[in-house]
């Protein structure tokens, strides 16, 4: 039971780190990156579909993104979705592809994005701490039900604390890396 609770908690913490990594990847830096379009959604035959799933996205130059839809008829819808997104970019429609030049970030916008990155990191840490709390509650229940002794549960709690610290530090590293990437001119 204890191993199962610990394994479950670690799996959920790993998922929280993965989600944080994806969230931080969507924050636009001064460089072109196909991942920045992962959260841009287009209505594709009645169902919301991410641009990344309905087009080929390439980065021919450090500040240029080229989007070529798999279906030419969707070009206008993709262009509109990108214009309406919070990315702050302006696509140029060349008939069969979209060219997007990534503008240089202002110092103020960089600071804003760093705050946003820190906020996403904090959300991930809260998620990890919530997983820890639920696992601690589960360990307390296991001990109360007499399924494990006090010593075993104590060791498991220490193990859980180490695991929590490991994943929180991973989040800190991700945020620090993103911050450095954003502040790099």
From Swiss-Prot:
Single GO molecular function: ribosomal large subunit binding
Keyword Ligase: no
Domain of life: Bacteria
Compartments where located: Cytoplasm
Keyword Protein biosynthesis: yes
Keywords, in A-Z order: Cytoplasm, Protein biosynthesis
Location (main, coarse): cytoplasm
CC annotations in GO: cytoplasm
A GO biological-process term: translational termination
Family membership noted in the UniProt record: Belongs to the RRF family.
PANTHER family in the record: MITOCHONDRIAL RIBOSOME RECYCLING FACTOR PSEUDO 1, RIBOSOME RECYCLING FACTOR
Main function: Responsible for the release of ribosomes from messenger RNA at the termination of protein biosynthesis. May increase the efficiency of translation by recycling ribosomes from one round of translation to another.
UniProt protein name: Ribosome-recycling factor
Protein's organism: Nocardia farcinica (strain IFM 10152)
């Amino acid at each position: 039971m204890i191993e199962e609770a610990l394994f479950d908690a670690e799996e959920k913490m790993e998922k929280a780190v993965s989600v944080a990594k994806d969230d931080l990847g969507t924050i636009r830096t001064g460089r072109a990156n196909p991942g920045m379009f992962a959260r841009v959604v287009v209505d594709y035959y009645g169902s919301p579909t991410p641009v990344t799933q309905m087009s080929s996205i390439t980065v021919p130059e450090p500040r240029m993104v080229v989007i070529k839809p798999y279906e030419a008829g969707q070009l206008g819808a993709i262009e509109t979705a990108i214009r309406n997104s919070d990315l702050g970019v302006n696509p140029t429609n060349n008939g069969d592809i979209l060219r997007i030049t990534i503008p240089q970030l202002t110092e103020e916008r960089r600071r804003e994005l760093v705050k946003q990155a820190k906020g996403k990191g904090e959300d991930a840490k809260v998620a990890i701490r919530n997983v820890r709390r639920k696992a601690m509650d589960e360990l307390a229940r296991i001990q109360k039900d007499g399924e494990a002794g006090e010593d075993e549960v104590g060791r498991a709690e220490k193990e859980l604390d180490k695991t929590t610290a490991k994943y929180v530090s991973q989040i800190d590293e991700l945020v620090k890396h993103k911050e450095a990437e954003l502040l790099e001119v």
